[in-house]
């Protein structure tokens, strides 16, 4: 998809080209109250990169393992002197790592051959991220990896309008659901119900309420959020982590045509709860759906930030909705395998590091983790950064 026109956030602190420091022998100061996390998305296991660190057609297992190695090295890296939260300090504790979905590429033909089964891709992700992230939170405990599904996990589980092999593989979506929502009775690939068992979970970390949800905030997810936020103080900042951008893609909604099924003619993917209301074509803008989300955010002003993947480049922007009644701080992140810029130029590979202080001020920094492919250990740099306030206020 093309880059949307979006109002840029007012940048309080920007660091372009500030080199990350080498590992320092000086121990970090005790962490202040707040929260710090890494956000990455669209790992796309099953695909290959055209080039990576001198290799050709490098698989996602190799690339993502290299990304995780840079996450593990973060605590001993210094923030740039960019005027943002904790500028110039050692990064120190990482409270969690968030993965924004599209972990396992669809099992369709890519580059003239079938993409590996989703269950194989999922095992590689678990090895690299779930078992491979070795950073600690501010309490000294291993930092968890929080996961939301993307459209590829859902298509692998329910089917797609193009041929896939196997036709369905529910393994990743079922395991995400079980690991993240911890149901009383774990689902299996036989008992998982894609309409009933949608991923929704929350975590309270450092005075911030994080909401992690299934693909996009459709009517079902908004109903879950309404119930959840009724138990959260309105003074508590809320951060949403999901896969799709706020201006959702029409094709992800339920087919409004005929039998409302997944078919090659209509090309709707039927992964959200709502039937598409803006026409009969996947090329139509999702104006009504976006308007419903805009109204929801306006009614819940404690929702202050939104992190997403899917469109695969680093961007900090304000989403205002079709009627421009809100200003939601929104953060789009790069993909290690399908980056809009980083696929052609591996030195632009990045993820995001978010730091929130006790006053609920947040700095989000782009971390360019492969700027010198010939010397990976030295080839890191801080990129763009933005600082925003998270304290709830009226959007109007």
List where the protein language model places each region.
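Bacterial N-terminal signal peptides that target proteins for export
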Residues: 1-11
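Extended active-site neighborhood of metal-dependent phosphoesterases/phosphodiesterases
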Residues: 108-224, 230-237, 263-271, 316-338, ...
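N-terminal active-site segment of His-dependent metallophosphoesterases
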Residues: 25-116
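His/acidic metal-ligating clusters that form di-metal
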Residues: 69, 73-93, 138-144, 190-204, ...
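A short C-terminal boundary segment appended to hydrolase-like catalytic domains
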Residues: 345, 349-396
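Short, solvent-exposed loop/turn elements at domain surfaces
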Residues: 35-37, 45-51, 79, 220-224, ...
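Bacterial N-terminal signal peptides
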Residues: 10-20
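Active-site glycine-centered loops adjacent to acidic/histidine catalytic or metal-binding residues
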Residues: 42, 101-102, 150-151, 243, ...
């Amino acid at each position: 998809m093309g880059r949307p026109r979006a109002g840029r956030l007012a940048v309080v602190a920007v660091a372009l080209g500030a080199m990350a420091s080498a590992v320092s022998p000086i121990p970090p100061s005790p962490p202040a109250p707040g929260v710090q996390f890494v956000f990455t998305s669209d790992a796309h296991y099953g695909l290959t990169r055209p080039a990576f660190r001198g290799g050709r057609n490098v698989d996602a297992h190799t690339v993502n393992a290299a990304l995780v190695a840079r996450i593990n090295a973060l605590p001993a890296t210094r923030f740039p002197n960019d005027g943002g939260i904790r500028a110039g300090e050692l990064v120190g504790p990482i409270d969690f790592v968030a993965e924004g979905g599209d972990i396992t590429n669809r099992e369709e033909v890519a580059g003239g051959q079938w993409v590996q089964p989703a269950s194989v891709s999922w095992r590689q992700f678990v090895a690299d991220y779930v078992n491979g992230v070795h950073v600690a939170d501010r309490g000294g405990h291993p930092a968890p990896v929080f996961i939301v599904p993307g459209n590829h996990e859902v298509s692998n589980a329910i089917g797609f309008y193009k041929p896939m092999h196997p036709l369905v593989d529910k393994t990743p979506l079922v395991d995400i659901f079980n690991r993240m929502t911890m149901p009383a009775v774990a689902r299996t690939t036989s008992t998982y119900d894609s309409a009933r068992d949608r991923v929704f979970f929350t975590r309270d970390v450092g005075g911030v309420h994080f909401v992690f949800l299934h693909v996009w905030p459709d009517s079902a997810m908004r109903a879950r959020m309404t119930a959840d936020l009724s138990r959260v103080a309105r003074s508590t900042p809320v951060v949403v982590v999901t896969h799709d951008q706020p201006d959702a893609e029409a094709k992800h909604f339920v087919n409004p045509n005929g039998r409302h099924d997944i078919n090659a003619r209509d090309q709707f993917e039927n992964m959200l709860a709502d039937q598409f209301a803006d026409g009969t074509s996947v090329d139509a803008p999702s104006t009504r759906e976006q308007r419903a989300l805009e109204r929801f955010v306006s009614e819940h002003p404690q929702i202050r930030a939104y992190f997403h993947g899917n469109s695969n480049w680093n961007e900090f922007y304000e989403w205002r909705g079709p009627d421009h009644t809100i200003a939601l701080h929104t953060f789009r992140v790069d993909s290690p395998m399908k980056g809009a810029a980083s696929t052609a130029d591996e030195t632009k590979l990045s993820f995001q590091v978010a730091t929130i202080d006790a006053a609920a001020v947040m700095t989000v920094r782009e971390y360019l983790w492969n700027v010198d492919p010939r010397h990976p250990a030295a080839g890191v740099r801080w990129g763009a950064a933005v600082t925003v306030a998270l304290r709830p206020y009226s959007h109007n």
